[in-house]
Amino acid sequence: VKDGQTVGFLGDSITAAGARPDGYCNLLIQALKAEGITAKPIYKGIGGHKSNQMLKRVDRDILQHKPDWMTLSCGVNDVWHGKNGVNLEDYKKNMTAIVDKAQAAGAKVLILTSTMIKEDQSGDLNQKLIPYNNFLRELAKEKKCLLADLNADMQEALKTAPADRPKGKKLTGDGVHMNPHGNVMMARGVAKALGFSDGQLAKIVTR
């Protein structure tokens, strides 16, 4: 990301909360600023949104603003909403179409793997999420997008989270939406994908 560029954040409620002062999107914008890069954010996270809804609104919400970059965070609701969710085959089509649209509009795309649904990897929903995230890793390779593997980062961060944090709420407030520690984890993951060094990543802390 270069000085003066625009970054669109497309996502669900996790991204909507990411626009708050302690949210991952704002932490990233502030981290860029600390490195002398002033980026203009477009925050477009909407609670409950799935890949089909994001595909319908990506032009209006993000691409009409001609962003240089777009982060794409989608998958939790596709899985979490069960029968009202989006099956894997449709998810693949929707996410591929979103990336194609963004790249055709001249935006570089950074894909975020979906963070965990409750902080227990053995849970049914997290197991169901695995093929969705595996697809995102493949999509990033195929389309030459950057990838922030936040699901892997979250699993690692939970292993080292202090024992005095409440069980099930070490990185989240409710098992899904990030607490300040989770937002730092996400911001660092995205910044790492953008090429931040370990020293630069260490400066991203809770606000």
Predicted regions, residues:
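Alpha-helical cap/lid subdomain in secreted, periplasmic
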Residues: 26-40, 52-206
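Short N-terminal segments immediately surrounding and downstream of signal-peptide cleavage
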Residues: 1-5, 203
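Catalytic cysteine-centered active-site loop
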Residues: 41-48
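Catalytic nucleophile-elbow at a beta strand-turn-alpha helix junction centered on a G-D-S/GDSL motif
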Residues: 5-20, 49-50, 79
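Short, histidine-centered active-site or binding-site loop motifs used for metal coordination
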Residues: 11-13, 45, 76, 115-116
